[in-house]
């Protein structure tokens, strides 16, 4: 009889250990996947989202700087314009080094051309005695700049939606893991009895 009880106890503990090992492997794999997804969000997706928003704002600030220059002729506005060009270049370099470069490149190319046209057709065309040409050029280029800004915003919204979807997935997986943990705890208690 002693061997029989001993065998049953060993079998019970073996089952408990096996169930615990399966649970530990599942939790480890699940946590590793969640960690990878969170790292993807924080290290790539979120910075891309921010960079696209900053690029959209940069275009708008460049338009405002060009308008300020035409209104006053003060070179501080051209300096402001080019400081935003530098900010945009840093953000663009970052995005071009990511997986989103293909979607981003057309807007980037348009913005580079747009900035050179602002320089040539607005800043260099500026003549205090005849502002009409520079104003007309800016009106045309302002609309183009707004379109580029909206393109960057569209990319940002797309990335925002992607982050939201990833977040919803992480919440779902977290709830599943909680449910599994509770059930596993109940099963282990029952097996231990």
List each model region and its residues.
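Cytosolic-side ends of inner-membrane transmembrane helices, especially those
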Residues: 12, 180, 184-193
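Alpha-helical segments in soluble extracytoplasmic regions
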Residues: 75-96
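Non-membrane, extended amphipathic alpha-helical rods used for dimerization/oligomeric scaffolding
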Residues: 82, 93, 153, 157-160, ...
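Short, Lys/Arg-rich, polar N-terminal cytosolic tail immediately upstream
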Residues: 1-3
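Amphipathic alpha-helical segments and their boundaries
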Residues: 5-60, 95-111, 145, 166-167, ...
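Polar/charged, Q/E/K-enriched amphipathic alpha-helical segments with strong coiled-coil propensity
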Residues: 38-41, 71, 78, 96-157, ...
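Amphipathic, well-ordered alpha-helical segments in soluble domains
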Residues: 27-30, 34, 58-61, 65, ...
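Structural signal for membrane-spanning alpha-helices in multi-pass inner-membrane proteins
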Residues: 24-27, 68, 192
């Amino acid at each position: 009889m002693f061997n029989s009880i001993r065998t049953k106890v060993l079998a019970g503990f073996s089952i408990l250990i096996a169930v615990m090992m399966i649970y530990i492997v599942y939790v480890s794999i699940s946590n590793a996947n969640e960690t990878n997804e969170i790292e993807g969000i924080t290290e790539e997706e979120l910075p891309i989202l921010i960079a696209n928003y900053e690029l959209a704002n940069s275009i708008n600030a460049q338009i405002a700087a060009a308008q300020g220059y035409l209104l006053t002729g003060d070179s501080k506005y051209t300096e402001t314009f080019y400081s935003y060009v530098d900010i945009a270049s840093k953000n663009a370099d970052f995005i071009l080094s990511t997986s989103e470069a293909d979607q981003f490149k057309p807007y980037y190319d348009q913005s580079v051309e747009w900035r050179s046209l602002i320089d040539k057709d607005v800043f260099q065309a500026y003549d205090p005695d005849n502002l009409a040409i520079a104003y007309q050029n800016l009106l045309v280029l302002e609309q183009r700049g707004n379109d580029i800004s909206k393109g960057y915003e569209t990319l940002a919204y797309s990335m925002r939606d992607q982050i939201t979807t990833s977040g919803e997935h992480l919440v779902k997986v977290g709830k599943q893991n909680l449910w599994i943990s509770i059930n596993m705890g109940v099963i282990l208690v029952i097996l231990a009895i």
